[in-house]
Amino acid sequence: MIKVVFMGTPDFSVPVLRRLIEDGYDVIGVVTQPDRPVGRKKVLTPTPVKVEAEKHGIPVLQPLRIREKDEYEKVLALEPDLIVTAAFGQIVPNEILEAPKYGCINVHASLLPELRGGAPIHYAIMEGKEKTGITIMYMVEKLDAGDILTQVEVEIEERETTGSLFDKLSEAGAHLLSKTVPLLIQGKLEPIKQNEEEVTFAYNIKREQEKIDWTKTGEEVYNHIRGLNPWPVAYTTLAGQVVKVWWGEKVPVTKSAEAGTIVAIEEDGFVVATGNETGVKVTELQPSGKKRMSCSQFLRGTKPEIGTKLGENA
């Protein structure tokens, strides 16, 4: 039986681990990030992958830094035939990458060489792509730069969010891995080098990227909101207060107004001018310190005026 070590951390990784178990591989160990404090009460919380591994009685390693010798030697001591990673969250050292008989492969949520990095799902939507996919490739120390083994395309729908696409790609990754590993073990795959001229990056989202830039086109603002839903969530400011924008709709704007200005207030939301003739009607938001709510709920208690400018004093 093929001995596999799995390395992964978030919910995205769980179906991949589950599929390895269902397919009958001997998952001899799981490597995941340390437990972290979560929420306002800072409750120490295990990763989704750790929770899944413990359901199946699989030993779990949680290195703070996998590149440290005493940590990677614990992985090597397991003597895996194959290592599979999916959103592990740390750079894996060569000592691990070179050890398994069948190598170390990664399940990545983009059609490499596009969108290397830790936030490919967010960027696929924020950039307005109509398709993305899963790539399974050999791991190298350079970020997501290994030779490609298999790929599958996944359509991005008009109203797709990062949350819904995350779920689709997670399942697609598990399914593709199930088909890829047997071919890899049988030596039936021809690795393909990535074209370095086509490389783009999707680095982890920073706080300053979350703010809506109303001077962009309506389509770009709409994609920005979708791409940051349900985390970390796009935001703007209204009357100097931070407001998270959970959802909005593209609408035509007939009157010219400065980008970021409220040009209409309707029962289910307010329309904001952008950098072109497509406005965005904000329909779901979350004022600072309050719960997420529909814009119609918000408007029952707060009455912004037409002409109010969003995005100032952030």
Swiss-Prot record:
Its EC number is 2.1.2.9. Gene3D superfamilies: Formyl transferase, C-terminal domain, Formyl transferase, N-terminal domain. InterPro entries: Fmt (IPR005794), Formyl_trans_C (IPR005793), Formyl_trans_C_sf (IPR037022), Formyl_transf_N (IPR002376), Formyl_transf_N_sf (IPR036477), Formyl_transferase-like_C_sf (IPR011034), GART_AS (IPR001555), Met-tRNA-FMT_C (IPR044135). One of its GO terms (cellular component) is cytosol. (6S)-5,6,7,8-tetrahydrofolate binds at residues 110-113. It comes from the Bacteria. It catalyses: L-methionyl-tRNA(fMet) + (6R)-10-formyltetrahydrofolate = N-formyl-L-methionyl-tRNA(fMet) + (6S)-5,6,7,8-tetrahydrofolate + H(+). Attaches a formyl group to the free amino group of methionyl-tRNA(fMet). The formyl group appears to play a dual role in the initiator identity of N-formylmethionyl-tRNA by promoting its recognition by IF2 and preventing the misappropriation of this tRNA by the elongation apparatus. NCBIfam families: fmt (TIGR00460). Belongs to the Fmt family. This is Methionyl-tRNA formyltransferase. It comes from Bacillus cereus (strain AH187).
